[in-house]
Amino acid sequence: MAQHTPATSRAGTFGAILRVTSGNFLEQFDFFLFGFYATYIARTFFPAESEFASLMLTFAVFGSGFLMRPVGAIVLGAYIDRIGRRKGLMVTLAIMGCGTLLIALVPGYQTIGLAAPALVLLGRLLQGFSAGVELGGVSVYLSEIATPGNKGFYTSWQSASQQVAIVVAALIGYSLNITLGHDAISEWGWRIPFFIGCMIIPLIFVLRRSLQETEAFLQRKHRPDTREIFATIAKNWRIITAGTLLVAMTTTTFYFITVYTPTYGRTVLNLSARDSLIVTMLVGVSNFIWLPIGGAISDRIGRRAVLMGITLLALITTWPVMQWLTAAPDFTRMTLVLLWFSFFFGMYNGAMVAALTEVMPVYVRTVGFSLAFSLATAIFGGLTPAISTALVKLTGDKSSPGWWLMCAALCGLAATAMLFVRLSRGYIAAENKA
């Protein structure tokens, strides 16, 4: 049977990568749409006395989905580590699809009152619950089918697939801006991309049904029960904590340059919606290019060199470039600054994903990776739009989101030093055998 055949043949490698990353595409497609259409969603579901209050409520609901990620990481991650990568990834896709359908179909506040924002919140919670293990499950799968010496390159396609989703979503949004008027988009047009997302769910189910189990999982003789999984996670809390800080840099930068960029460009820098979409498309293409490069370079010179080099560069340059952007904001400056941040994200994340799979205990690799990633996304990435909006409002400084990006870079630098010191001293290897 297909599900018991190890996914190791060269001929099937590309197909395996495509099938396993298809769910990543859907997840990021929906998340980007929520960020880009935040102002329209705010008016539809969260009417308030001021645009700022309405937008903050929307971003709070957006962030709530990330708070469910750690729960999904633990529950679904333990399930995947116990029963297999293939079956677990099918379950996450089903839950994600339910959340997507709910957001696309729920009527507005004017039609059903408080039930509208409540249902949107439920949809985001379902998406967050499934997404809590989606990245981890995909990353672990890719790391386990990778050929020797190419783990960084293979795992980089987890994030690269998300960039395709960003470009596709931005292209759809750009097309709608050209063909529909502002009023039409505000009233009903913003739902069209969400319906498109619903339409591709059956295709992704077909792709994932033919996914083969990894040889590494099939060869495991021991299948830990839930108690063993939780005990191992508790024993390795230091690795989980360091992993969370390691992910902070990538998740904060990513959600700033993709999800928050359209809102930042329109409401803070006063650029047009079309300009913001074009910049976002360019960022998606740039991310797609730099991610596999970062992963491949880390395979050659080591994860630590890439991670520390990029975090130091981010700490040195983030504030000056944000000041330069906001001094005279225009399309060219915004493009250059975000492409610079895209370089940070792609290179760092390309190395980081492989590093995180390598330091996690083998029997809880999915739940450990997913928990660290989910905590970082909930604390840092998911709250980036709300924190950035609040910083600009409270300080009156349009470049103030740069401080948040620098904070995340500092976390990444500290985590890299912490993990690789422990790795060099043999602590992590010993813990992984426990």
Swiss-Prot record:
<comment type="function">
    <text>Uptake of citrate across the boundary membrane with the concomitant transport of protons into the cell (symport system).</text>
</comment>
<feature type="transmembrane region" description="Helical; Name=3">
    <location>
        <begin position="88"/>
        <end position="108"/>
    </location>
</feature>
<feature type="transmembrane region" description="Helical; Name=2">
    <location>
        <begin position="55"/>
        <end position="75"/>
    </location>
</feature>
<feature type="topological domain" description="Cytoplasmic">
    <location>
        <begin position="76"/>
        <end position="87"/>
    </location>
</feature>
<keyword id="KW-0163">Citrate utilization</keyword>
<feature type="transmembrane region" description="Helical; Name=6">
    <location>
        <begin position="187"/>
        <end position="207"/>
    </location>
</feature>
<feature type="transmembrane region" description="Helical; Name=11">
    <location>
        <begin position="367"/>
        <end position="387"/>
    </location>
</feature>
<feature type="topological domain" description="Periplasmic">
    <location>
        <begin position="43"/>
        <end position="54"/>
    </location>
</feature>
<feature type="transmembrane region" description="Helical; Name=12">
    <location>
        <begin position="401"/>
        <end position="421"/>
    </location>
</feature>
<feature type="transmembrane region" description="Helical; Name=4">
    <location>
        <begin position="112"/>
        <end position="132"/>
    </location>
</feature>
<dbReference type="GO" id="GO:0006101">
    <property type="term" value="P:citrate metabolic process"/>
</dbReference>
<keyword id="KW-1133">Transmembrane helix</keyword>
<dbReference type="InterPro" id="IPR036259">
    <property type="entry name" value="MFS_trans_sf"/>
</dbReference>
<feature type="transmembrane region" description="Helical; Name=8">
    <location>
        <begin position="277"/>
        <end position="297"/>
    </location>
</feature>
<dbReference type="InterPro" id="IPR011701">
    <property type="entry name" value="MFS"/>
</dbReference>
<feature type="topological domain" description="Periplasmic">
    <location>
        <begin position="326"/>
        <end position="335"/>
    </location>
</feature>
<feature type="topological domain" description="Periplasmic">
    <location>
        <begin position="388"/>
        <end position="400"/>
    </location>
</feature>
<dbReference type="InterPro" id="IPR020846">
    <property type="entry name" value="MFS_dom"/>
</dbReference>
<feature type="topological domain" description="Periplasmic">
    <location>
        <begin position="109"/>
        <end position="111"/>
    </location>
</feature>
<feature type="transmembrane region" description="Helical; Name=10">
    <location>
        <begin position="336"/>
        <end position="356"/>
    </location>
</feature>
<protein>
    <recommendedName>
        <fullName>Citrate-proton symporter</fullName>
    </recommendedName>
</protein>
<feature type="topological domain" description="Cytoplasmic">
    <location>
        <begin position="422"/>
        <end position="434"/>
    </location>
</feature>
<feature type="topological domain" description="Cytoplasmic">
    <location>
        <begin position="1"/>
        <end position="21"/>
    </location>
</feature>
<feature type="topological domain" description="Cytoplasmic">
    <location>
        <begin position="357"/>
        <end position="366"/>
    </location>
</feature>
<keyword id="KW-0813">Transport</keyword>
<feature type="topological domain" description="Periplasmic">
    <location>
        <begin position="260"/>
        <end position="276"/>
    </location>
</feature>
<dbReference type="Pfam" id="PF07690">
    <property type="entry name" value="MFS_1"/>
</dbReference>
<dbReference type="InterPro" id="IPR005829">
    <property type="entry name" value="Sugar_transporter_CS"/>
</dbReference>
<keyword id="KW-0472">Membrane</keyword>
<feature type="topological domain" description="Periplasmic">
    <location>
        <position position="186"/>
    </location>
</feature>
<dbReference type="GO" id="GO:0005886">
    <property type="term" value="C:plasma membrane"/>
</dbReference>
<keyword id="KW-0997">Cell inner membrane</keyword>
<feature type="topological domain" description="Cytoplasmic">
    <location>
        <begin position="298"/>
        <end position="304"/>
    </location>
</feature>
<feature type="transmembrane region" description="Helical; Name=9">
    <location>
        <begin position="305"/>
        <end position="325"/>
    </location>
</feature>
<keyword id="KW-0769">Symport</keyword>
<feature type="topological domain" description="Cytoplasmic">
    <location>
        <begin position="133"/>
        <end position="164"/>
    </location>
</feature>
<comment type="similarity">
    <text>Belongs to the major facilitator superfamily. Metabolite:H+ Symporter (MHS) family (TC 2.A.1.6) family.</text>
</comment>
<keyword id="KW-0812">Transmembrane</keyword>
<keyword id="KW-1003">Cell membrane</keyword>
<dbReference type="GO" id="GO:0015293">
    <property type="term" value="F:symporter activity"/>
</dbReference>
<feature type="transmembrane region" description="Helical; Name=7">
    <location>
        <begin position="239"/>
        <end position="259"/>
    </location>
</feature>
<dbReference type="InterPro" id="IPR051084">
    <property type="entry name" value="H+-coupled_symporters"/>
</dbReference>
